[in-house]
Amino acid sequence: MFIGTIILVLSFLGFVFNRRNIILAFICLETMLLGINLILLRNSVLFDDISGSLFAIVIIILAGVESAIGLSLLVSYYRLRGVINSYGI
């Protein structure tokens, strides 16, 4: 019924329980943003407001930029140190 809320809660739990692996933490953060976007889009359609849809598009763009920058930083850190778990940092 409320798929956005379910995705948001499950990804938050995944983030809390998988804090050791940074890649999984990034994936959980991205799915949290997906859940927030689904909630925004649902409320935008429900209240017949276009600003929620526009804000969801902005969040999708920023999430793509954030994941590209984060992944490139992880690749550089892995090349430098050889480990990418959170205890190695």
Swiss-Prot record:
Annotated Pfam families: Oxidored_q2
EC nos: 7.1.1.2
Membrane topology: Multi-pass membrane protein
Disulfide bonds: none
Positions of transmembrane segments: 21-41, 55-75
Record's subcellular location: Mitochondrion membrane
Keyword list, A-Z: Electron transport, Membrane, Mitochondrion, NAD, Respiratory chain, Translocase, Transmembrane, Transmembrane helix, Transport, Ubiquinone
Gene Ontology MF terms: NADH dehydrogenase (ubiquinone) activity
Catalytic activity: a ubiquinone + NADH + 5 H(+)(in) = a ubiquinol + NAD(+) + 4 H(+)(out)
GO aspect biological process, one term: ATP synthesis coupled electron transport
Cellular component terms per the entry's GO annotation: mitochondrial membrane; respiratory chain complex I
Keyword Transmembrane: yes
Gene3D superfamilies: 1.10.287.3510
Subunit structure: Complex I is composed of 37 different subunits.
PANTHER family: NADH-UBIQUINONE OXIDOREDUCTASE CHAIN 4L, NADH-UBIQUINONE OXIDOREDUCTASE SUBUNIT ND4L
Family of this protein: Belongs to the complex I subunit 4L family.
Physiological role: Core subunit of the mitochondrial membrane respiratory chain NADH dehydrogenase (Complex I) that is believed to belong to the minimal assembly required for catalysis. Complex I functions in the transfer of electrons from NADH to the respiratory chain. The immediate electron acceptor for the enzyme is believed to be ubiquinone.
Protein name (record): NADH-ubiquinone oxidoreductase chain 4L
Organism placement in taxonomy: Eukaryota, Fungi, Dikarya, Ascomycota, Saccharomycotina
